Swiss-Prot record:
This is Penicillin-binding protein activator LpoA. It is a lipid-anchor. GO terms for biological process: peptidoglycan biosynthetic process; regulation of cell shape. The keyword Signal applies.
Length: 603
C-alpha cells in the first residue's frame, strides 16, 4: 500500500504569500488618468510633477501645465518659467496650447511685461475651446492693455469678454467700459474710431462723446441722450446705464420764475450791495432766453427781520433766492426757511460762505473769497514747478487768513515747508524784506566775525537761496515798494525768485512804478479781452475801478448760476465759464472759481 504524498507547508505558503504581495501592490495610490486644466490648481507643484513623471503623452502635458499654474500661484516665477519652456517643446492639443498661452501670459504680467502679453497671447479663431478659456483670454488682454494705458483697446477686449461671462458680471464690465472712456479728454475721445463691425463699442463711444462735448448745454445733452436710448434699447448701456448718464436722464430742468435778490442796500455794505445788484440786473437784461413771465424782487435785508423776510418771500411766491450777502443774515434766514431735516423751502445761492456749512440744505454759496484766490495761487505755483515758495502777507487778520489758505493748499502737493513773512507799514517794508531774505542775520554774523578778528572784512551780506518764488498779497501801492526791495535783497550772483501777486495788485489805475515781470491773478473779465462787454459797461458805468467791476461780475455770475446749478449738481465736474472765473461746485455746493493769470508789463 502506497503512502499518500505529504504536501510541504513552505511550498504551500509561497504562492499564497505571492498573491497577497501582488494584491497589496495593486491596492496602492494610483495616478489619475485625467485632469481639467482649465481649473485653478489645488495641489502643490511637487504633487503635479510626481503625476507628470508617472505619465506620458498628452496626460503628462496636462500635469505639467497644472504644475506651471501652481508655481505662478505660489509666486515661484523661476519654476514657472522652466515649466513653460519645457511645455513649449511638447506636442499640445488646442486646449493645451490655449492653457499654455494663458499661463505664459500670466507669467509675463507678473513681470510687468504687458507688451509681451499682447504679442504672445494669440488664440486662433478656429480653435474649439471651452468658454472658460476664452473668458480668461480676454480678461488677460484687458489687464495687459490697461497696464499699457490703452483704455480704448482694453474696451475692445471688454466688449468681447462680455459674450463669455454670466449676467451677474455684465454690469461690472459695463461699468469698467464707461470708466475707461471717461478718462479721455474732450479732444482725445473724438479721435477714437471703432471698426464698422464694432457696433457695441461704437455705442459706448458715442455716449461718451455726447457727455464730453455737450456738457455745457445740459438740456440739449438730455434730449440727445433720450433719443439715443430710444433707438438703442438692446445696447448694454440701456441695460446697465452709467449713473452719470442716468442722473442726466432723471434731471428735471426747471428754471426759476420768481427770483428774490436779497442784499444790504442800506448801511455799511450798501455800496458793495448796489454793485452786485447792478451786475445781476445787467446780466438779466442781456439774457435773450429769459422767460417773459420771469420776475425779480430786490429786497434790502437791513429793512426787515428774518421772519418778515420769510413772509415776504412766501407772499411773492419766490422760487429762488440770490443772497443774502452778510454771513449772519445767511445763517439766520437759513434757520427760518429750514424744515425739520434742515432742508430749506426755497433753493438759494448765498453770496457769502458761513463759518460753518451744513450739507444737503439746498443752499449753494458764491463769493469773491481771498482764501479761494490764494489757494489757487499755491496750486498754480506748484503746477509751474516751484518748490520753495515764500508768502509775503500784510500783518493782521487778512494776512493770517491768506497765509493759512496758502499753506493748507500747498500741503496737498508738497511736503516742503512754506516760508512766511508778514509786513507792516511802508516805513518798515525794507527791513521786513531784508529780514525774510536773511540779510539781517548775515550782517550780524559779519559784525561778529569782525569783532572777533578786530579787522574789517571785505565781504557783503548774503541772502538766503532756498526760495524760488514769492507770492505777495499786497495792494499795488505796496507792491511797487516791495518789488525793488526784493531785487536789492537778492545777491547779484543768485537766481532771483519769481514774483507773484494777487488781484489786489491790479487796481486798474495807471502804474507809475515798474511792476514788469510780476505774475498776478484776477477774474477773467479783467484779464481777457471782450470788446462787446467792455463797451457796454463803459457806457453804463464809466470810470469804474477794478474793485467795483469785480463786484458787478459777481452779480453777473450769480444770475448765470441760477440756470446752471441744477446741472452742476448732477453732472460731475460740470464747469461754467463765468465773469469771475471758471465755475464749479464741490460736495457742499460751494462755488469754486478758477481765476486767470497775467504778467505785469506783458503785451
Amino acid at each position: 500500500m502506497m503512502n499518500p504524498k505529504r504536501l510541504s507547508v513552505p511550498r504551500l505558503l509561497t504562492p499564497v504569500a505571492l498573491a497577497i504581495t501582488l494584491a497589496a501592490c495593486s491596492s496602492g495610490p494610483k495616478t489619475p488618468t485625467s485632469v481639467d486644466i482649465t481649473l485653478e490648481p489645488t495641489l502643490s507643484v511637487q504633487n503635479y510633477m510626481i503625476n507628470a513623471d508617472s505619465s506620458e503623452g498628452s496626460l503628462q502635458a496636462d500635469w505639467l501645465i497644472m504644475a506651471a499654474k501652481a508655481a505662478l500661484q505660489n509666486g515661484d516665477l523661476a519654476q514657472a518659467d522652466l515649466l513653460i519652456k519645457r511645455l513649449a517643446r511638447m506636442p499640445l492639443s488646442e486646449v493645451q496650447q490655449a492653457e499654455w498661452q494663458l499661463t505664459r501670459a500670466a507669467y509675463h504680467l507678473k513681470l510687468n511685461q504687458a507688451d509681451n502679453v499682447i504679442e504672445l497671447l494669440n488664440f486662433k479663431a478656429w480653435w474649439k475651446l471651452p468658454n472658460e478659456q476664452w473668458k480668461d483670454y480676454y480678461t488677460l488682454r484687458v489687464e495687459a492693455y490697461t497696464a499699457l494705458q490703452q483704455p480704448f483697446e482694453a474696451n475692445r477686449q471688454l466688449v468681447t469678454l462680455s459674450q463669455y461671462v454670466d449676467e451677474s458680471q455684465q454690469a461690472e464690465i459695463a461699468q469698467q467700459i464707461w470708466a475707461n472712456f471717461t478718462g479721455y479728454s474732450q479732444y482725445e475721445i473724438t479721435q477714437l474710431h471703432p471698426d464698422a463691425s464694432e457696433e457695441v463699442l461704437d455705442g459706448w463711444l458715442q455716449l461718451a462723446i455726447y457727455m464730453k462735448t455737450m456738457s455745457a448745454n445740459v438740456p440739449q445733452l438730455k434730449n440727445t441722450l433720450e433719443h439715443w436710448f430710444a433707438e438703442n434699447t438692446a445696447h448694454p448701456a440701456a441695460l446697465y446705464t452709467p449713473a452719470e448718464i442716468q442722473s442726466i436722464l432723471d434731471l428735471e430742468i426747471v428754471q426759476p420764475v420768481h427770483t428774490a435778490l436779497l442784499l444790504p442796500l442800506s448801511g455799511k455794505y450798501a455800496k458793495q450791495a448796489q454793485l452786485i445788484r447792478d451786475g445781476f440786473i445787467f446780466a438779466m437784461m442781456n439774457d435773450k432766453d429769459r422767460d417773459p413771465e420771469a420776475t425779480l424782487k430786490v429786497i434790502d435785508t437791513n429793512l426787515y427781520q428774518p421772519h418778515q423776510l420769510k413772509q415776504q418771500l412766501t407772499d411773492e411766491q419766490i422760487d429762488f433766492i440770490v443772497g443774502p450777502l452778510r454771513k449772519d443774515v445767511i445763517e439766520v434766514l437759513q434757520g427760518e426757511l429750514s424744515d425739520d431735516s434742515g432742508q430749506v423751502s426755497i433753493p438759494s445761492l448765498a453770496l457769502n460762505i458761513p463759518d460753518e456749512l451744513q450739507t444737503g440744505t439746498g443752499i449753494c454759496y458764491l463769493t469773491l473769497s481771498p482764501e479761494q484766490e490764494v489757494a489757487q495761487a499755491a496750486k498754480h505755483l506748484f503746477a509751474n514747478g516751484y518748490k520753495y515758495p515764500l508768502i509775503f502777507a500784510p500783518q493782521g487778520n487778512l494776512g493770517q487768513r491768506v497765509v493759512s489758505a496758502f499753506e493748507a493748499e500747498w500741503k496737498k502737493y508738497s511736503t516742503n515747508k512754506v516760508a512766511v513773512s508778514y509786513f507792516g507799514d511802508k516805513r518798515q517794508l525794507q527791513r521786513d524784506v531784508n529780514s525774510v531774505f536773511g540779510l539781517q542775520e548775515s550782517q550780524q554774523r559779519i559784525a561778529q566775525m569782525e569783532g572777533l578778528m578786530k579787522l574789517p572784512m571785505e565781504t557783503q551780506p548774503r541772502s538766503r537761496r532756498d526760495i524760488d518764488s514769492v507770492y505777495i498779497a499786497a495792494r499795488s501801492s505796496e507792491l511797487t515798494l516791495i518789488k525793488p526791495f526784493i531785487e536789492v535783497a537778492v545777491n547779484p550772483d543768485a537766481k532771483p525768485p519769481k514774483l507773484f501777486s494777487n488781484s489786489m495788485s491790479n487796481s486798474g489805475e495807471k502804474q507809475y512804478e515798474d511792476l514788469t515781470g510780476i505774475v498776478y491773478s484776477d477774474i477773467p473779465m479783467l484779464l481777457e479781452v471782450n470788446p462787446a462787454l467792455d463797451s457796454q459797461m463803459e457806457q453804463l458805468w464809466p470810470d469804474q475801478s477794478n474793485f467795483q467791476k469785480r463786484l458787478q461780475a459777481l452779480g453777473m455770475d450769480a444770475y448765470k448760476l441760477m440756470a446752471e446749478l441744477p446741472q452742476m449738481k448732477v453732472v460731475p465736474n460740470h464747469a461754467v465759464n463765468g465773469q469771475t472765473g471758471v465755475l464749479t461746485i464741490d460736495d457742499q455746493c460751494v462755488v469754486h472759481r478758477e481765476i486767470s493769470w497775467k504778467e505785469h508789463g506783458a503785451l
